[in-house]
């Protein structure tokens, strides 16, 4: 069983001390991991579906990648670049590539690096592939979930302890929230979906019955107003 000690640079020294002293450490990725064989089986089972989504995305109407990227403004860009402090020849992993804002900023700071860009969103993966065309020696685009990271990295030939820094910017981005077709927008009308990778699994709508939605409104809004059932039925 393999464990990849991929640490965010800002915690690198502290986490190393914890490891040496045997103290459980929350920075190790992943904390729980299946055997390598299990990871490969899971990865191979989903890879074909993922690639089909990406091919369909590329065959769809022409997309302005720069416009798509501008939909989301990454947070704390200067702080991230300062924290990672990229140096010539180093290798990094961006586990939430999104529209690539952080990755671009890192490359602007130091272009002579290698950066693995992971995202489960086919749209984000398409953006990563587009960026890899501009930086063919620097960007390695990967499509998959966090749980698939080990299998993807092993397939790419990445050895344990390779990365000099890892970035995770967790949460949804404007690409999901401002695009009603994605089914996650709170600002615009659109189908209910809320999946990051819309081609996999059954739509969330299938599981959200009126009673469950009514309960959710009560729990999360902390009130039971008369119109809640009507809202859910709509």
UniProtKB/Swiss-Prot annotation:
The keyword Methyltransferase applies. Keywords: Methyltransferase, S-adenosyl-L-methionine, Transferase. SUPFAM superfamilies: S-adenosyl-L-methionine-dependent methyltransferases (SSF53335). The keyword S-adenosyl-L-methionine applies. One of its GO terms (biological process) is rRNA base methylation. This is Putative methyltransferase-like protein 15P1. The gene is METTL15P1. Coiled coil: none annotated. Pfam families: Methyltransf_5. It comes from Homo sapiens (Human). Probable S-adenosyl-L-methionine-dependent methyltransferase. Its EC number is 2.1.1.-. Belongs to the methyltransferase superfamily. RsmH family. The lineage of its organism: Eukaryota, Metazoa, Chordata, Craniata, Vertebrata.
